[in-house]
Amino acid sequence: MKLHDLTPAPGSRKPKKRVGRGPGGTDKTAGRGHKGQKSRSGAGKGPFFEGGRSTLISRLPKRGFNNVGTTYEVVNLAQLARVEGDTLDRTALERAGLVRRKDRPVKLLARGQVTRAVTVQVDAASEAAIRAVEAAGGRVVVTGADRQNAEQAG
């Protein structure tokens, strides 16, 4: 005996009734009764319907707001010494553990000193950070991806 030889015992599985297909399928109204919301196709009340009164969600007060300001993942100049390589982009910063949130743009700030010439590729950078990296012989490439994301979102 193999797996495909197994069948359920006779009478143990009742066939599905096809409603609305003649007298056996309880005929015309197919067990839905006459007219009304529940007789219609696709009809029914939503899970939060409360019989017509104001729902709980609309009775509770509004709270908070959506801040449209961009929240950055901040990387400071002093932290760049921990990252190996001459080109420091988002993936290099993520590997070094300086950037954790993938949904936020990266911004370079000027706290600390740069000890070597590096090329830093970030979404945004402060003017002081750009000056400090260029003074050390490196360069900062500002991609501005956060602006593109903001335009797409709003």
Curated annotation (Swiss-Prot):
Keywords: Ribonucleoprotein, Ribosomal protein, RNA-binding, rRNA-binding. Residues 1-54 are annotated as: Disordered. This is Large ribosomal subunit protein uL15. GO terms for cellular component: cytosolic large ribosomal subunit. Part of the 50S ribosomal subunit. Pfam families: Ribosomal_L27A. Binds to the 23S rRNA. One of its GO terms (biological process) is translation. The gene is rplO. GO terms for molecular function: rRNA binding; structural constituent of ribosome.
